[in-house]
Amino acid sequence: MALRLILGFDYGTKQIGVAVGQVITGQARELCTLKAQNGVPDWNQVEALIKEWKPDAVVVGLPLNMDGTPSEMCARAEKFARRLNGRFNLPFYTHDERLTTFEAKGERLVRGGQKGSYRDNPVDAIAAALLLQGWLDENTALFES
C-alpha cells in the first residue's frame, strides 16, 4: 500500500496533539489538539478526523527519556497506537518525540504566541507536527520507488 497522507499524534494524558503530513511533499503541519481524560480521547472526535482526512497510516510519538530509554508514558503511547490500529485498521508507526514540546513552545513564541501557561496555550498540535516531520524526514526511503 502506498502511503500518501499520514496523521501524527502527540499523545498525552490530558491533551493529544494532531498533525497531518503528506508524503509527496514531505511536509507536516498541525491540525488540532484533542482533550483526553487520563489518556483516553473522545474516540468520536478521532473517528471524525480519520473520516475527514482518510490517512493511509498514523504516527504516534514515543516520549523517550533523554538517554533513549522508554519513559513511563511510552507504554501508554504504544497502547494508544495499537488502539488506533484496532479501531480504524490503520498501520501505525512510532517516532521518538524527545524535545518536541520544548521546540514547539519556542515555535509558538516565534509565531507571536504568548508565554503564558501550558494549559492556556497548548502546543500539542505543533509538537505533533514536529514529530511527524521528523518521521517523514527519516523515512523518505520507504516512499521512493
From Swiss-Prot:
Signal peptide: none annotated. Gene3D superfamilies: YqgF/RNase H-like domain. It holds the Pfam family RuvX. GO terms for cellular component: cytosol. SMART domains: YqgFc. GO terms for molecular function: nuclease activity. Its main location: cytoplasm. One of its GO terms (biological process) is rRNA 5'-end processing. Keywords: Cytoplasm, Hydrolase, Nuclease, Ribosome biogenesis. The keyword Repeat does not apply. InterPro entries: RNaseH-like_sf (IPR012337), YqgF (IPR005227), YqgF/RNaseH-like_dom (IPR006641), YqgF/RNaseH-like_dom_sf (IPR037027). It is an enzyme of class 3 (hydrolase). HAMAP family: Nuclease_YqgF (MF_00651). Belongs to the YqgF nuclease family. This is Putative pre-16S rRNA nuclease. It comes from Pseudomonas fluorescens (strain Pf0-1).
